[in-house]
């Protein structure tokens, strides 16, 4: 639900849109920062996600209370990209303990699991078409690879997005058991053992 050489050209930094410029700029804030999200980031994440998904699918992968739920239980399975202290892109995941995703995995975090279920990847509308989604995904996979308990990453997406995720080492497992209303999805898995990101700097 969510492009790009290892060293993509750096586009001219866009002006922060009103929704983002509400975060006051301070010289002490890093121009660009990656970090795990906290429950305090939930509202900003939901605003980005709602704009990205509602107009296209009519639903959000996670709603505000679910975002807070996962950022409270497993913030280490999230990653946000911040510009001047404001969130511009993020991924939220949780652990799952079965071989395949199922309906319960949409809302559950299983601490004993070894599969990181990627619930959502979203980029603020003012920062799209800049290669940020792929960069963030590479960094997230590297982040997961540093966690010994996580052996695989799994996600579900529409068929049109399968080639995008295959570029990062994901493999289609067939139709996903999860449905959302009338929407159906393909399930993809990525082994974190021997993945190229372990031998390759993302160039960010």
Swiss-Prot record:
Site feature (Important for the catalytic mechanism) residues: 117, 119
Coiled-coil blocks: none
Binding site for substrate: 121, 156
Post-translational modification (record): cAMP-dependent phosphorylation regulates AANAT activity by promoting interaction with 14-3-3 proteins. Phosphorylation levels exhibit night/day variations, with an increase during nighttime.
Binding site for acetyl-CoA: 121-123, 129-134, 165-167
Pathway: Aromatic compound metabolism; melatonin biosynthesis; melatonin from serotonin: step 1/2
GO CC list: cytoplasm; perinuclear region of cytoplasm
Phosphoserine: residues carrying this PTM: 202
Domain of life the protein comes from: Eukaryota
InterPro entries assigned: Acyl_CoA_acyltransferase, GNAT_dom, SNAT-like
Main location: cytoplasm
EC number(s) from the headed UniProt entry: 2.3.1.87
Residues with Phosphothreonine modification: 28
Keywords, comma-separated and alphabetical: Acyltransferase, Biological rhythms, Cytoplasm, Melatonin biosynthesis, Phosphoprotein, Transferase
Expressed in which tissues: Highly expressed in pineal gland and in the photoreceptor outer segments in the retina. Expressed at about 100-fold lower levels in the pituitary gland and testis. Not detected in other tissues.
Cellular compartments annotated: Cytoplasm
Catalytic activity: a 2-arylethylamine + acetyl-CoA = an N-acetyl-2-arylethylamine + CoA + H(+)
Domain N-acetyltransferase: 32-193
Gene Ontology biological process terms, A to Z: cellular response to cAMP; circadian rhythm; melatonin biosynthetic process; N-terminal protein amino acid acetylation; response to light stimulus
Assembly and oligomerization: Monomer. Interacts with several 14-3-3 proteins, including YWHAB, YWHAE, YWHAG and YWHAZ, preferentially when phosphorylated at Thr-28. Phosphorylation on Ser-202 also allows binding to YWHAZ, but with lower affinity. The interaction with YWHAZ considerably increases affinity for arylalkylamines and acetyl-CoA and protects the enzyme from dephosphorylation and proteasomal degradation. It may also prevent thiol-dependent inactivation.
Protein family membership: Belongs to the acetyltransferase family. AANAT subfamily.
Function recorded in the entry: Controls the night/day rhythm of melatonin production in the pineal gland. Catalyzes the N-acetylation of serotonin into N-acetylserotonin, the penultimate step in the synthesis of melatonin.
Protein name according to UniProt: Serotonin N-acetyltransferase
Native organism: Macaca mulatta (Rhesus macaque)
């Amino acid at each position: 639900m969510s492009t790009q050489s290892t060293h993509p050209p750096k586009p001219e930094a866009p002006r922060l849109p009103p929704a983002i410029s509400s975060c006051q700029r301070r010289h002490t804030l890093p121009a660009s920062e990656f970090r795990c999200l906290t429950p305090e980031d939930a509202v900003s994440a939901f605003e980005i996600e709602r704009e990205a998904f509602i107009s296209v699918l009519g639903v959000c992968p996670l709603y505000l209370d679910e975002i807070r739920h996962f950022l409270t239980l497993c913030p280490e399975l999230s990653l946000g990209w911040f510009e001047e202290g404001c969130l511009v892109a993020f991924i939220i995941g949780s652990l799952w303990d079965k071989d395949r995703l199922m309906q319960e995995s949409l809302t559950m975090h299983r601490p004993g699991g070894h599969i990181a279920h990627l619930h959502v990847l979203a980029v603020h509308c003012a920062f799209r078409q800049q290669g940020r989604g792929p960069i963030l995904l590479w960094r997230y996979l590297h982040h997961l690879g540093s966690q010994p308990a996580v052996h695989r990453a799994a996600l579900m997406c529409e068929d049109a997005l399968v080639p995008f995720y295959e570029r990062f080492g994901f493999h289609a497992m067939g139709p996903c058991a999860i449905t959302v209303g009338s929407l159906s999805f393909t399930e993809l898995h990525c082994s974190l053992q021997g993945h190229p990101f372990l031998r390759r700097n993302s160039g960010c």
